Every structure is written in structure tokens, then in C-alpha cells.
Swiss-Prot record:
Gene3D superfamilies: Single-stranded right-handed beta-helix, Pectin lyase-like (2.160.20.10)
Catalyzed reactions per annotation: (1,4-alpha-D-galacturonosyl)n+m + H2O = (1,4-alpha-D-galacturonosyl)n + (1,4-alpha-D-galacturonosyl)m
Loss of function: phenotype: The mature pollen grains are arranged in a tetrad. No visible phenotype regarding floral organ abscission.
Organism: Arabidopsis thaliana
Descriptive protein name: Polygalacturonase QRT2
Effect annotated for changing residue 372 to A: In qrt2-1; loss of function
Gene: QRT2
GO biological process: anther dehiscence; cell wall modification involved in abscission; fruit dehiscence; pectin catabolic process; pollen sperm cell differentiation
Region (Disordered): 43-69
Length: 439
């Protein structure tokens, strides 16, 4: 009996402290967020009140050790009257970034703020920055005021950041789109700003935000780690040029979940350096589908691995799930799963193209290619807008390897009949019911 008590005591003393110390940060944060302190803070944020009420008590009746500090952009001079509010936002950011503990930056609801190009830089002293966008942030309309044409709103080198609130970010893309060479081939091909870019941000969550009418791409994660992008609405017209919805570059451990993307380019694009990417619960269309690539442009080296796309619905897109690489590239795209996907009137539901070329002039034929391997298509069904629903255009010299299809059924939308497959230089394995089949 005593021996059992001793053993139990040793267990409690040894393991319980480590359990509490390793309790996930986001769970602790969820506990904080459920308290009365958060409810009151959140309620006052939306209406634009400053919140520094240290006397508030949580639901258990105990005063918190320290209340989060809140920095309202209006307090720093934002007017939301059609003039430039960039300086006020920057001042609010600098105050929050230089503070310790948990801090809020608040853009209240029922306000429409105009911003020129801004960069919110770290590193910051705060343990967590929560950027609450309740209102609407709109891009400055004069392109000549953009010193650097490729970015509008940038978060750079910021750890432990959350951007949320249910508000809108509008890129005013209608000013930029007519200047694109894809709209007017007589014009030079110049870049336009990405609406929101996160660069080298770790432990990042972007949620409950609507991004619309981006100048070019809507949302980019570049060289980030441990990212969650949740409950996003990304929209722009189907004919808006290069308006990718969510672009992932050089980023590891990212979850994109429960989001709707309707754009003029890829709904989600995943390019070199990205690893451990999961996209689930995605509704895509119009747009160019969910793409890995393009990879290997200009004979470059590219690597993408461990990608899972599941529980997606694609509606009227020009592609479904796509892997695209340029001739002449090097590297690999491997360990990729597309599963539990519904296609509705999609032009190329399943496609691998190692002969991708997005140029006016023809691309030269080259022997090297990015290796595509270990790709699984599972539980995919729906309709194709063209007779060919499955297309594998793989390299003669570096063919696609380890491509598997399981329980795939795609029919021709125009004929309501069995569709066709076009396959070249691919080593394919099929299981279960697969239609169409490569011949």
C-alpha cells in the first residue's frame, strides 16, 4: 500500500508540472478569451472605446494580473474621412510593438480607413499582438504614390501575431487591372501590389477577414512558420488579372481552413520552399483552381513537399487540382495528397503539367525538369466542362512517378457521359473505381 502511494506521489511530482508547462499557448489563450475581461474588451473595441480597465474581474470573480493594453487607431489620429490614415496606423503599431504582454490594435467598425503602402515591422516586445479589424481598410487610389509597386500592407518579422475581427481589406484593384498586360497586351508587363503580405512571421493566425479586389495577389505568406489561415473570404472578379487568393511561398507548417476564394487566378497557389501545407474545407471558384506551382521557372531549383488538400469544392474553375512546372527547372514536388474533392463544371479537374509556359512566346524545349512524385488522388468526383478530365503531361526525361488514383469518378458535363484521360510519361497506379482511366 505504502509503495503504491510513493509511486503515485513520484508520478504526480514528476509529470504534472511538465503537463501544465507544456499546455499549448493557443489553449491558454482560448481560456483567456472566454473570460469576462475579453468579452468587455471585445465589446468596447468594436465601438471604438479605449480599454485600460484594470478593475475588471473575470468570471471567477478574481481580478486579472494585468489587462491587455489596447491601441485604437483613432486615438493616434485616424479619421476615416477619405484622407490618408497610414501614419496613424503606423503610430498605433509602434506603440503596440514596443509594449510588453498581450496588446491589441483596433480599427473600429463602421469606419472606412484609407492606407498607402505600409510595413508593420518587428521584432516586437509584446508576447502577442492581436490586430482587430472591425471596419474597412481601403487601398490608396493613386498608383504613383506607391514607392514600391509590389506590396501594399506588409507584416514583417513579427512573431505571435493574430489578425482578425470580421472586417474588410479592399485593394481597389479596379484601378490597377486595366494597366495589366494580360488585359491590354500593348502595355508593358509590370507588377502590381500584393494586398497583404506576411514575411518571416512565426506563430501567426489570420482569421475572419474579408479580402477583396486585390491589386494583384490577395494574401501571401512568405518564409513563415506555424501559420493558421481560417474562415477567410477572398473575392475579386473572374477576369481580374493575377489575383491569386492565398499564395504560400517558402512557408512551413501552414493550415488553410474553412475559406471561400473567388478570384481571377489560382484560389490557392503553393510554390517553392513550402512544406507541411494543409488546405481543408475550401470552396474555390471562379478562379484557376488549387495549384502547386508554378515551379522551376528560368531553370530555377524548386522544392515542395507534404501537401494535403482535402474537403474542397471547386466550381467553374479553369483547373481543379493542378501541379505545374516549367521545363528546365530542377528539384522536386513530392508527397502530395488530393482527397475528398468535388468538381462542378471544372475545365481541367486533375492535371499535372511539366510543360507549363505562361509567356506570349513559346518556351524552348529543355531536358531537365522538376521531379513530380508520390501524388495521391483519392475520393474525387464531379463534372468536367470538357471531355478530357484527367491530364498528365509529364517530362520524357524525368517522368512523373508514384502517381496513384483511388475512387475517382469524373464525367463530361456536356455529354453527361464518361470523360476521357490524356496521359504521357507517367507511372500510374489505380485502386477502386477510377474513371476515366489512362490508356
Amino acid at each position: 500500500m505504502y509503495e503504491k502511494i510513493i509511486i503515485l506521489s513520484v508520478f504526480l511530482l514528476t509529470f504534472l508540472p511538465s503537463c501544465f508547462s507544456s499546455y499549448p499557448f493557443n489553449h491558454r489563450d482560448d481560456l483567456f478569451m472566454s473570460s469576462n475581461v475579453y468579452y468587455e474588451t471585445n465589446r468596447q473595441h468594436q465601438h471604438g472605446h479605449n480599454t485600460r480597465n484594470s478593475h475588471l474581474k473575470n468570471r471567477h470573480g478574481y481580478a486579472p494580473r494585468s489587462s491587455p493594453r489596447s491601441f485604437n487607431v483613432n486615438t493616434f489620429g485616424a479619421k476615416a474621412n477619405g484622407n490618408d490614415d497610414s501614419k496613424a496606423f503606423m503610430k498605433a503599431w509602434e506603440a503596440a510593438c514596443s509594449s510588453t504582454g498581450i496588446v491589441y490594435i483596433v480599427a473600429p467598425k463602421n469606419r472606412d480607413y484609407m492606407l498607402k503602402a505600409v510595413t508593420f515591422s518587428g521584432p516586437c516586445k509584446s508576447s502577442l499582438i492581436i490586430f482587430k479589424i472591425y471596419g474597412r481598410i481601403e487601398a490608396w487610389e493613386n498608383p504613383s504614390d506607391y514607392k514600391e509597386r509590389r506590396h501594399w500592407i506588409v507584416f514583417e518579422n513579427v512573431n505571435n501575431l493574430r489578425v482578425e475581427g470580421g472586417g474588410r481589406i479592399d485593394g481597389n484593384g479596379h484601378i490597377w487591372w486595366p494597366k495589366s498586360c494580360k488585359i491590354n497586351p500593348q502595355l508593358p508587363c509590370l507588377g502590381a501590389p500584393t494586398a497583404v503580405t506576411f514575411v518571416e512571421c512565426n506563430n501567426l493566425r489570420v482569421s475572419n477577414i474579408r479580402l477583396e479586389n486585390a491589386q494583384q495577389m490577395h494574401l501571401t505568406f512568405q518564409d513563415c512558420k506555424n501559420v493558421k489561415a481560417l474562415n477567410l473570404m477572398v473575392t475579386s472578379p473572374a477576369d481580374s488579372p493575377n489575383t491569386d487568393g492565398i499564395h504560400v511561398s517558402g512557408t512551413q507548417n501552414i493550415l488553410i481552413q474553412d475559406s471561400i476564394v473567388r478570384t481571377g487566378d489560382d484560389c490557392i497557389s503553393i510554390v517553392s520552399g513550402s512544406e507541411n501545407v494543409r488546405a481543408t474545407g475550401i470552396t474555390c471558384g471562379p478562379g484557376h483552381g488549387i495549384s502547386i506551382g508554378s515551379l522551376g521557372e528560368d531553370n530555377s531549383e524548386a522544392y515542395v513537399s507534404n501537401v494535403v488538400v482535402n474537403k474542397a469544392t471547386l466550381i467553374g474553375t479553369t483547373n481543379g487540382v493542378r501541379i505545374k512546372t516549367w521545363q528546365g527547372g530542377h528539384g522536386m514536388a513530392k508527397n502530395i495528397i488530393f482527397q475528398d474533392i468535388i468538381m462542378k463544371n471544372v475545365t481541367n479537374p486533375i492535371i499535372i503539367n511539366q510543360d507549363y509556359c505562361d509567356r506570349v512566346e513559346a518556351c524552348p524545349e529543355q531536358k531537365s525538369a522538376v521531379q513530380v512524385s508520390n501524388v495521391l488522388y483519392k475520393n474525387i468526383q464531379g463534372t468536367s466542362s470538357r471531355p478530357i478530365a484527367v491530364k498528365f503531361v509529364c517530362s520524357k526525361n524525368i517522368p512523373c512517378r508514384g502517381i496513384s488514383m483511388q475512387n475517382v469518378k469524373l464525367v463530361d458535363q456536356t455529354q453527361q457521359d464518361v470523360s476521357k484521360a490524356s496521359c504521357s510519361n507517367v507511372k500510374l497506379d489505380t485502386r477502386g473505381n477510377v474513371s476515366p482511366l489512362c490508356t
